[in-house]
């Protein structure tokens, strides 16, 4: 499961703490974004992508992608991998299109869609 959560477009109604109960979580964003999310998800691993092509290849090979607005989510959307978009209620301009793609603005929906894609 690939995660890329930027500082810029976060939904402050959402937390990722429930992911501590899951394995195989890989963060591919910036080091400081990883360190911030690792406070909530201690089992989160980090990979520093060499370039955007490698990032796209990693996203393409994932079980599913979780992210907010940014390059990572744009790649996941373009590649049509199963994906979860952390929607920003202050700036709702991106919407998932296609099968196995969901957006969430509230914690209950995040956990529900996560379980659906992880089954």
Predicted regions: what is each one?
Residues 1-10:
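Conserved donor-binding/catalytic core segment of Leloir-type glycosyltransferases
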Residues 10-93, 98-101:
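Donor-binding and catalytic core of enzymes assembling or modifying cell-surface/extracellular glycoconjugates
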Residues 95-119:
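Leloir-type glycosyltransferase catalytic cores
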């Amino acid at each position: 499961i690939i995660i890329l959560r930027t500082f810029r477009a976060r939904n402050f109604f959402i937390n990722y703490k429930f992911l501590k109960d899951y394995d195989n979580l890989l963060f591919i964003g910036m080091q400081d974004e990883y360190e911030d999310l690792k406070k909530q998800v201690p089992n989160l691993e980090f990979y520093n992508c060499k370039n955007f092509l490698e990032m796209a290849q990693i996203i393409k090979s994932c079980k599913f992608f979780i992210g907010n607005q940014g390059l990572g989510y744009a790649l996941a959307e373009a590649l049509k991998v199963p994906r979860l978009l952390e929607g920003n209620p202050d700036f709702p301009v991106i919407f998932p299109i296609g099968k196995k793609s969901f957006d969430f603005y509230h914690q209950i929906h995040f956990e529900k869609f996560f379980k659906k894609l992880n089954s």
